[in-house]
Regions:
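Catalytic cysteine-centered active-site loop
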Residues: 1-42
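Structural motif
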Residues: 45-46
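Generic marker of residues within folded, mature protein domains
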Residues: 50-52, 95
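Short glycine/proline-centered loop/turn elements that form peptide/ligand docking sites
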Residues: 41, 54-56
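Aromatic- and glycine-rich peptidoglycan recognition patches
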Residues: 31-37, 57, 63-118
Length: 118
């Protein structure tokens, strides 16, 4: 299962429908200001987006305290589902790679069908 499919499944399990692809999920969310040194505004359940300045290519689910769950491939990841951290103290190669590609974060505040979440 790829990263955006994992996010879609996680939200669907709670009755919340979000778009399929990472770049669509990024556009769908309410932006949350985030950087590697400033994680204070992130809440558990927020989506974290990674990629190049031009395009979102990866998405993860924030668990709290800068940790996130994601599904990543063999080239830049764990070849499956894992948990990594945005904190600089986490020197694992996977965490370092994705930290270098951090684009931002977003909060899901409605379903894809337009239903507002409370």
């Amino acid at each position: 299962m790829d990263c955006s499919g994992l996010m879609q499944l996680a939200f669907a399990s709670q009755g919340i429908w979000i778009p399929r692809d990472a770049y669509q999920q990024e556009r769908f969310c309410q932006p949350v200001a985030v950087s590697v040194g400033a994680l204070d505004l992130l809440r558990p359940g927020d989506l974290i987006f990674f990629g190049s300045p031009r395009r979102c290519t990866h998405v993860a689910l924030h668990l709290g305290s800068g940790r996130y769950r994601h599904s990543s491939g063999q080239q830049h990841g764990r070849n499956g589902i894992g948990v990594d951290s945005l904190h600089l103290a986490d020197r694992h190669p996977v965490a370092s790679h994705y930290r270098s590609e951090l684009r931002g974060a977003g909060r899901v505040i409605r379903c894809h069908d337009g239903t507002t979440l409370s």
